[in-house]
Amino acid sequence: MAEIENRPSNFIRTRIDQDLASGKHASTHTRFPPEPNGFLHIGHAKSICLNFGIAKDYNGLCNLRFDDTNPEKEDINYVNSIKEDVQWLGFNWDGEIKYSSNYFDILYDYAVELINKGLAYVCFLTADQAREYRGTLKEPGKNSPYRDTASDENLALFEKMRNGEFKEGECVLRAKIDMASSFMVLRDPIIYRVRFAHHHQTADKWCIYPMYDFTHCISDALEGITHSLCTLEFQDNRRLYDWVLDNISLECHPQQIEFSRLNLEYTIMSKRKLSDLVVNNHVEGWDDPRMPTIAGLRRRGYTPASIREFCLRIGVTKQENMVEMGMLEACIREDLNENAPRAMAVLDPVKIVIENYDADKVETLSVANHPNKEEMGRRDVPFTREIYIEREDFKEEANNKFKRLVLDKEVRLRGAYVIKAQRVEKDENGEITTIYCTYDPETLGKNPSDGRKVKGVIHWVSASEAITAEVRLYDRLFSVPNPAAADEFESTLNPDSLVILTNAKLEPSLANSAAEQGFQFERTGYFSRDSKAKNIVFNQTVGLRDSWSKTQ
């Protein structure tokens, strides 16, 4: 066993420790089994970190297996995106990628075994009839009229299903368990159905496909999984998981353990609802930076380390709860504060003219890329007579609490000089167009020699050397903490979740930034270079501090 000092503690790991100590298992073998019918989201990241994290901490194995039993909704593009997301998060699966479809021949043989044992039968009830026969939570179901068909006849019918001699919906193969069971999942569940659909792995070899509950447990057993971890909605399904494995000739019997899924404030995790957002053009796609998908978080500027840290902090329990969005944002904020280089960007620019600075002069200033990490180096920032500052950083009149630029008062420019506002120029609407200032040439990197105090510091960029870029400011996608609870979840969308600024002025070094590279725009927030835009676009990742909670 690996060293345990830094391992997270939870009930699953306690169970694993007990199994290893008792000799039930010599090592651990977990798996992450997504269905390739959509893009992974932050909820899947919790399962990824749990399963791959256990393999890492216990020197065990973790498989990546695609649960590809529903070809009509699956696509090879989803397969590829899931592989990319898992690796981007920092994990690698053991051995070859697995597919449930790899086991279709074996699954068919086990279905035949159940038929031979009198534990499965071909049923011709319509969907409406089957629903009626199933009963309710308060009333037991009743047996299908096809339940007692002889095994030989069922074998022949099942072979006809495989040969495509029945239409879709005409018949299914059902497990024969107990129509009076208090657990609905045990009331003769469907284990095979007819589907004339092209499969991304097996092409047109099959026209019958096994159901998830039949496939999942057998796939686990075939791969030697020791601990099959899934979310709480599959708790009742564990009884079917165990029933299948107890009634076929497979020695390996993995243990299914359930944990609570991730519920995150101000977003949704339902694939169907996320798809609705895309289809109805509420977002720009599955990788829209407002989406909780891994692709969306990545494009917004979240790092793999921040997502792993978030999954570590929320822990693993059986208790369903709503996690504050602020916890996720705190993880990326801490990561970027520690690791992101600094840069200056003016999002709402107003021009300053420094009247006593040479009009033709371009001075190159050396500015640290990180205030606490000398190893991150320095960069050159051009300083000129005309610069831009944030419009909100200037007032004609202000009290002493306003530590920025005010008429007849001084402020320091980050990494440069102290300037003093002398007068302003306005347009016909009274909007300030230019602020005229003077500078103290003796204050580069030092305080005024006469001892006067200059308390405020603001950021700036050179007007002539700056690059113009688009900056996208993001807010919560929804305006309520639990949009999934609303009758019409789309009615809770936040109309101000995206603000696009087209005239931001950035220091020229940012022109050479790489896609997905994160920065702290000084005094503004954390931003990431967009990975899809042809022009220079920066997406806001998160603010410098959690201002949202203070306004609630």
Curated annotation (Swiss-Prot):
- Coiled-coil intervals, chain numbering: none
The alphabetized list of GO BP terms reads:
glutaminyl-tRNA aminoacylation; glutamyl-tRNA aminoacylation
Record-linked InterPro entries: aa-tRNA-synth_I_CS (IPR001412), Gln-tRNA-synth (IPR004514), Gln/Glu-tRNA_Ligase (IPR050132), Gln_tRNA_ligase_bac (IPR022861), Glu/Gln-tRNA-synth (IPR000924), Glu/Gln-tRNA-synth_Ib_cat-dom (IPR020058), Glu/Gln-tRNA-synth_Ib_codon-bd (IPR020059), Glu_tRNA_lig_a-bdl (IPR020061)
Per the record, the major location class is cytoplasm
Reactions it catalyzes: tRNA(Gln) + L-glutamine + ATP = L-glutaminyl-tRNA(Gln) + AMP + diphosphate
PROSITE patterns in the record: AA_TRNA_LIGASE_I
- Reported EC number(s) for this entry are 6.1.1.18
Can you cite an annotated GO cellular component? cytosol
| One Pfam family of this chain | tRNA-synt_1c
Name the family the entry cites: Belongs to the class-I aminoacyl-tRNA synthetase family.
Query: Which NCBIfam families does its entry note?
Result: glnS, PRK14703.1
Descriptive protein name? Glutamine--tRNA ligase
